[in-house]
């Protein structure tokens, strides 16, 4: 049976959503199906307005209950970084998964990461490393991007770009004005590679 996949993301200025949609495209091109969910916002509208954050995309449902993820085999997730770790919105979501941790509901499921930072050296790799603790506590199997299909992109130093072997990524700029580059979007081929990897598993 084909794996059931959900991409979960939090995006302030839309950069992570752009990556999420590109990852979903890769999964579909590989023959898979995927659902997208937004992690709920924790900032007030007043703060978001001062940050010049655009409105959320209401066509993508919020994941209001972690139980929803129990219905999926794999859930790659994307988020910006805050001090080299999950932002508060993601931390709040994970803090609500105590029931799943207690019952092992996420044990043996698969996940990958894609990350947005403001600048080069802004925490893409440290955020991925920090995420390993949460994934390990849940028994979630991490599938990295790796070099197999991306060495020609990750090894190209002709321009500044996000992403690493841990997963796809982008730089937003301190004010959110920089959009994902063509090369960063090419690295969301991670979606296709992830699907091909987990499709080898016999999900029952």
Curated annotation (Swiss-Prot):
Stored Pfam families: Flavodoxin_1
Keywords recorded for this protein, A-Z: Allergen, Cytoplasm
Subcellular localization, as worded in the UniProt entry: Cytoplasm
Coiled-coil segments: none
Keyword Cytoplasm: yes
GO molecular function: FMN binding; NAD(P)H dehydrogenase (quinone) activity
Domain Flavodoxin-like, first and last residues per copy: 5-195
Entry keyword Protein biosynthesis: no
Entry GO terms, CC: cytoplasm; membrane
Domain of life assignment: Eukaryota
InterPro entries: Flavodoxin/NO_synth (IPR008254), Flavoprotein-like_sf (IPR029039), Flavoprotein_WrbA-like (IPR010089)
PANTHER family named among the record's database cross-references: FLAVODOXIN-RELATED PROTEIN WRBA-RELATED, FLAVOPROTEIN-LIKE PROTEIN YCP4-RELATED
Family under the similarity heading: Belongs to the WrbA family.
Record-given protein name: Minor allergen Cla h 7
Organism expressing this protein natively: Davidiella tassiana (Mycosphaerella tassiana)
């Amino acid at each position: 049976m084909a794996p059931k996949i959900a991409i979960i993301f939090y995006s302030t200025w839309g950069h992570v959503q752009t990556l999420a949609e590109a990852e979903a495209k890769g999964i579909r091109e590989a023959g898979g199906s995927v659902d997208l969910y937004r992690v709920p916002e924790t900032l007030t509208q007043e703060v978001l307005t001062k940050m010049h954050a655009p409105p959320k995309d209401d066509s993508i449902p919020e994941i209001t209950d972690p139980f929803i993820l129990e219905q999926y085999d794999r859930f790659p997730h994307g988020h910006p970084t805050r001090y080299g770790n999950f932002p508060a919105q993601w931390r709040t979501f994970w803090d609500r998964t105590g029931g799943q941790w207690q019952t092992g509901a996420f044990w043996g499921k698969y996940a990958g990461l894609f990350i947005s930072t403001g600048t080069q050296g802004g925490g893409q790799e440290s955020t991925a490393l920090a995420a390993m603790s949460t994934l390990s506590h849940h028994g979630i199997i991490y599938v990295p991007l790796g070099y197999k299909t991306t060495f020609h992109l990750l090894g190209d130093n002709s321009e500044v770009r996000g992403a690493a072997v841990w997963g796809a990524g982008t730089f937003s700029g301190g004010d959110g004005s920089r959009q994902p580059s063509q090369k960063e979007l090419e690295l969301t081929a991670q979606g296709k590679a992830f699907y091909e990897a987990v499709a080898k598993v016999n999900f029952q």
